[in-house]
Amino acid sequence: MSLFSEVAELALEIDSYELTALDRTFESGFTRPSTLITLNGGGESGRGEDVVYDDLDHIAHRDIGPVHDLSGPRTLGEFCELIGGLDLFADAPPIRDFSRRYRRWAYESAALDLALRQAGRPLYEVLGRSLQPLNFVCSVRANPAEEGDAEHVLEPIASRLSKSPGTRFKLDPQPDWSDEVIDWLLASGAVDSLDLKGCYKDTPVDVEASPEFYERIATAFPEAWLEDPEINEETTPVLERYRERVTWDAPIHSAADIEALTWKPRIVNVKPSRVGGLEDLSEAYEYCEREGIGAYGGGQTELSVGRDQIQYLAAMMHPDTP
């Protein structure tokens, strides 16, 4: 029986739902919009977090309010089927189409939370699994190289290591990193993975791909995972040599996406909100287990229950990876 089948028959009763703003502005000036979805029923409440990135999408969602009738489904499976047929951006289409997956995850994770509370059972028990201690990696961006010397570039990493020695990092390498920056990072022994940001286009975070850049980074950090490179005619010959360390995040929305990758990976980043629906997430986890592909998890700067939920799933599905 599939993971989804195990939870689909959970009884579910929904009387009402609420939308609550959770936006937060960080010291860097970045504002993370977020909306808490709360489903109420049977004297319990289940919560999920909408991690869509665009402010206007959140504003439109909150302004229109709880307009959908979610009271019909009597099981979690029926609820997921209903959500799959609803336009959760009824007031205005999303700025980015993949945001539909993020919002679907918010509603379906809230429904799973509610169904489990109404049943009085934890998820690991329903699935016949166990929870294990997690390994965490800190994802952080170095300071821009053009704004100072190596000490300035490395300050976000060095300050964290001074407070928590032994911390390991997922970093976003840049073509303008100096030899001094790379040598310091290598000597620290703290680099777990390097996000090449090659699968993003026209965003504030994408990094221009080049065979020279990829060769330099792959050679400098011989034990680090190389996440999300751009594959093209120029970079493929370089990446072929390091394919055992190449992993993926941004392109992964389903089991089919994992199967369609250029090379069968040793490990991939399975983000529940990026996948979207509970059934699709179940299929992605099961595909990885069946094919002997490892999974690790990553966040979307969740501000509330979304962070707890993805950590719970990681502790149950892939506790030995970050």
Regions found by a protein language model. Give the residues of each.
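Short helix/strand-capping turn motifs
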Residues: 320-322
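Broad gene-expression machinery/nucleic-acid interaction feature
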Residues: 34-36, 133-135, 267
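Short alpha-helix boundary/capping motifs
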Residues: 29, 105-106, 278, 304
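Metal- or metallocofactor-binding catalytic centers and their adjacent structured scaffolds
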Residues: 40-119
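Catalytic core of soluble alpha/beta enzymes
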Residues: 177-314
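Hydrophobic/aromatic-lined pockets within catalytic cores
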Residues: 31, 116-119, 318
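Active-site-facing alpha/beta catalytic cores
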Residues: 98-231
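Structured beta-strand/loop patches that form or line metal/cofactor-binding pockets in enzymes
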Residues: 1-58, 62
